């Protein structure tokens, strides 16, 4: 029932006279194969854990431990995990759980006998003395460590250029600004890309970017003029006409009072990565075109790449992968640093509340919330606030499947139905095939979060409670860079 019992003394307890304490370790969060490893196994042995009879999601094992402090971690289905509901610390090896086994007249430094008495756990008549979870288990980040880490990241980004973000091979799609909106809509869907730069043949230059927010605003605008969206309405609007209309809606005018579309935010291949990141953050865009011209007047520009925060973060992770100790903040749990947006009951208060959706909410209300909250995605939760899915701006392109935009009313379709439509849609290329919800725990280290966000197509991580998947917060690429750059 409990699996094999491990003796941490390795047979030396009799000679040393040390008392061994049977200690039960429990992993209550499920899995197929679960192992335990720790300082008491010299981190070289993985002890198999057995499912609890009648409760296959709970794994346990008993180990005989010597008195003193021990560190341990769980190896669950090929991934190292720790239990955030037990005492844990952060170190060079990542986040590990800790346990203190008392011997005769032993009291851990910083704890009174009364404190230890309160932290006893009665398990099958085996008393386990552990550090009190209410005590500060996570080391505080010093201001010196923070500034040192930010300085080193700033130096790295200031000495690397956008040219280093260019892939060895690939393609970048640009759209003619005179294309009908409907055709552009279908191209983005069929190619599986969220956005594309706009080319104006008359001016001989790139003039903007078309992305998911444009389609959200278009569908909401057209939806106010009738009960259904028609292909004819989308067919009569070119991208150029839409951009001009968008400027009018946003009250962007030139000196003559004419609508003036927002100028293109772009970078050159030799701009440093810090400037590229700042342009993305300051202009609140998902990516910026990397454009090169060999002529001083900028004529005959060449579109090389779309630079994103994900690519820059991948550069940071790659550079510091084997020297993480030079960035003290990397091993900090995300719950201990001012990063992301959290629900009010978790972490520090935030001036920006965390938006969530219920699956039965209308698609129209979801799109309105995306625009009003100025976010790129919203977690979809059940009545217990547990994560079900996530609705993102880029999901709007799923309405191009079978011309669904011409057959639905935004206030009649639910978020659940829209997500189902997106799952049924299978564009031949692109990033939309694969895992939708990317999650992390509040106890995960910053470096673990950064490495996940550096993967292509991952723009945010939803922070969930272990086991229940109750949403605790969300961390975006923008959040990480604002923290790393001290903005």
Swiss-Prot record:
Organism phylogeny: Eukaryota, Viridiplantae, Streptophyta, Embryophyta, Tracheophyta
GO molecular function, one term: protein kinase regulator activity
Quaternary structure annotation from Swiss-Prot or TrEMBL: Subunit of a probable heterotrimeric complex consisting of an alpha catalytic (KIN10 or KIN11) subunit, and a beta (KINB) and a gamma (KING or SNF4) non-catalytic regulatory subunits. Interacts with KIN10, KIN11, KINB1, KINB2, KINB3, HSPRO1 and HSPRO2. Interacts with BZIP63. Interacts with FLZ2, FLZ8 and FLZ13.
One Gene Ontology biological process: mitochondrial fission
Residue ranges constituting the CBS domain according to the UniProt record: 165-227, 260-324, 350-408, 432-487
Record-given protein name: Sucrose nonfermenting 4-like protein
Predominant subcellular localization, coarse grouping: nucleus
Organism: Arabidopsis thaliana
PROSITE patterns linked to this entry: CBS (PS51371)
């Amino acid at each position: 029932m409990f699996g094999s019992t491990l003796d941490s003394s390795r047979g030396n307890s009799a000679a040393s006279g040390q008392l061994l304490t049977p200690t039960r370790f429990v992993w209550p969060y499920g899995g197929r194969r679960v192992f335990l490893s720790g300082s008491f196994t010299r981190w070289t042995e993985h002890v198999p854990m057995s499912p609890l009879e009648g409760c296959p999601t709970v794994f346990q094992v008993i180990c005989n431990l010597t008195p003193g402090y021990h560190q341990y971690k769980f190896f669950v289905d090929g991934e190292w995990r720790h239990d955030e509901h037990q005492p844990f610390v952060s170190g060079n090896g990542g986040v590990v759980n800790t346990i203190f086994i008392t011997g005769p007249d032993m009291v851990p430094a910083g704890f009174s006998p009364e404190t230890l008495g309160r932290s006893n756990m009665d398990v099958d008549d085996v008393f386990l003395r552990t550090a009190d979870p209410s005590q500060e288990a996570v080391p505080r980040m010093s201001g010196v460590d923070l500034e040192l880490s930010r300085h080193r990241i700033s130096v790295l980004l200031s000495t690397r250029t956008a040219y280093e973000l260019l892939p060895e091979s690939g393609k970048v799609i640009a759209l003619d600004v005179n294309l009908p909106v409907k055709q552009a809509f279908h191209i983005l869907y069929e190619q599986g890309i969220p956005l594309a730069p706009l080319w104006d043949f008359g001016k001989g230059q790139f003039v903007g970017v078309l992305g998911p927010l444009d389609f959200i605003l278009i569908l909401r605008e057209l939806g106010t003029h009738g009960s259904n969206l028609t292909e004819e309405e989308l067919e009569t609007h070119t991208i150029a006409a839409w951009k001009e209309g968008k400027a009018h809606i946003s009250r962007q005018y030139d000196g003559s009072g004419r609508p003036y579309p927002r100028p293109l935010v772009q970078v050159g291949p030799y701009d440093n990565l810090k400037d590229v990141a700042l342009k993305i953050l300051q202009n609140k865009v998902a990516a910026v075109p990397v454009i090169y011209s060999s002529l001083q007047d900028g004529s005959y520009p060449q579109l090389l790449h779309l630079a994103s925060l994900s690519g820059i973060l991948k550069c940071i992770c790659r550079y510091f992968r084997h020297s993480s100790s030079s960035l003290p903040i990397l091993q900090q749990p995300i719950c201990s640093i001012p990063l992301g947006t959290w629900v009010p009951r978790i972490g520090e208060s935030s001036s920006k509340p965390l938006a969530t959706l219920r699956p039965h909410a209308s698609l129209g209300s979801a799109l309105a919330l995306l625009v009003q909250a100025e976010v790129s995605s919203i977690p979809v939760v059940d009545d217990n606030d547990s994560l079900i899915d996530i609705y993102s701006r880029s999901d709007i392109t799923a309405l191009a499947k079978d011309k669904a935009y011409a057959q639905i009313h935004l206030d009649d379709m639910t978020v659940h139905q829209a997500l189902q439509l997106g799952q049924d849609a299978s564009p031949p290329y692109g990033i939309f095939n694969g895992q939708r919800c990317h999650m992390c725990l509040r106890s995960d280290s910053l470096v673990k979060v950064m490495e996940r966000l550096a993967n292509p197509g991952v723009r945010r991580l939803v922070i969930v409670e272990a086991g229940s998947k109750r949403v605790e917060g969300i961390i975006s690429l923008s959040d990480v860079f604002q923290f790393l750059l001290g903005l």
